[in-house]
Amino acid sequence: MLYLIGLGLGDAKDITVKGLEVVRRCSRVYLEAYTSVLTVGKEALEEFYGRKLVVADREEVEQEADNILKDADISDVAFLVVGDPFGATTHSDLVLRATKLGIPYRVIHNASIMNAVGCCGLQLYKFGETVSIVFWTDTWRPESFFDKVKKNRQNGMHTLCLLDIKVKEQSLENLIKGRKIYEPPRYMSVNQAAQQLLEIVQNQRIRGEEPAVTEETLCVGLARVGADDQKIAAGTLRQMCTVDLGEPLHSLIITGGSIHPMEMEMLSLFSIPENSSESQSINGL
C-alpha cells in the first residue's frame, strides 16, 4: 500500500501518532523535499522516526514516480509531505498513478498553511482563492494572479499568497548544456513579495487602471507558522516591504475590503510596533 503522510508544519514531533506508526512499519519511506520545508533537517526526522528517509526531489516525483511506487502492491511504502499531503497537485498525480497500477493508497492528514493561517486571527471562511507569487526574472514578470486578488477583495475576501520556493533548480545555461549543476535554495520573503506587489500596483496605475490594492492596504506577514519561533506581523503593504520576519518559510495575506471587529482586534496583537521605523497603527488604517 502507498501511504501519503502529512508531517505538519513545525518539527519532527508534529507527525500524528497514526502517521508515525505507519512510518515505522513501512519498507521504504520517502521525504518529499521541494513543495515545502520543515524547520528541522532530514537527520532530525530520521532520529525521531527511527527510520532512514529517501529524499524525493521534484524530478523524481514528477518524472520517475514509478520508482516510488515500485513494489507498493506487495509492501508498504510511505511518502512524507510537509503540511498536508494534498497541499500540492503533484501528490494527487501520485495517487492517480498508483490507482492505475492497482496499488491501494491511504492518506493520513495533518495541519497545513491553508488552515493554520487562522493563527493570525482572520476567519478562515472569509478567505477567497489562494494565489502563488513567484520570483521574477529579467524576462518573466507575471502579474495575472493579481486578477484573483482583485476578485477576492471585491467580494470582501482575504487572499492567502503562497511564496515561491526554489529547491534544486538549474540555471538556464546549465539546463541547456545538460549539466547537473543546481542553484542554491531560495525562499521568497514577505519583503520580496510585497515589493513585487507594489510594482504591479504602479504598473496598473501607469496603464490607467484602478488597482485593487494600494500601498496602504492592510496585510499580514507570517513566518514559520507552526514552529516555536513563528512570527506574525500586521501592517500596510508598504510596511511589509521592510518588516523583519526572519528565516523562511514566509506567507503573505492581503486582507479583504471588509474586516470583522474581532478580526481587527486579533490583528492588533500583531501590529508592527509604533516605535518601528516603518510603523503605522492598525487602528489608523
UniProtKB/Swiss-Prot annotation:
Coiled coil: none annotated. The modification Phosphoserine is found at residue 171. It catalyses: 2-[(3S)-amino-3-carboxypropyl]-L-histidyl-[translation elongation factor 2] + 4 S-adenosyl-L-methionine = diphthine methyl ester-[translation elongation factor 2] + 4 S-adenosyl-L-homocysteine + 3 H(+). GO terms for molecular function: diphthine methyl ester synthase activity. S-adenosyl-L-methionine binds at residues 9, 84, 87, 112-113, 163, 225, 250. It is an enzyme of class 2 (transferase). SUPFAM superfamilies: Tetrapyrrole methylase. One of its GO terms (cellular component) is cytosol. This is Diphthine methyl ester synthase. It comes from Homo sapiens. The gene is DPH5.
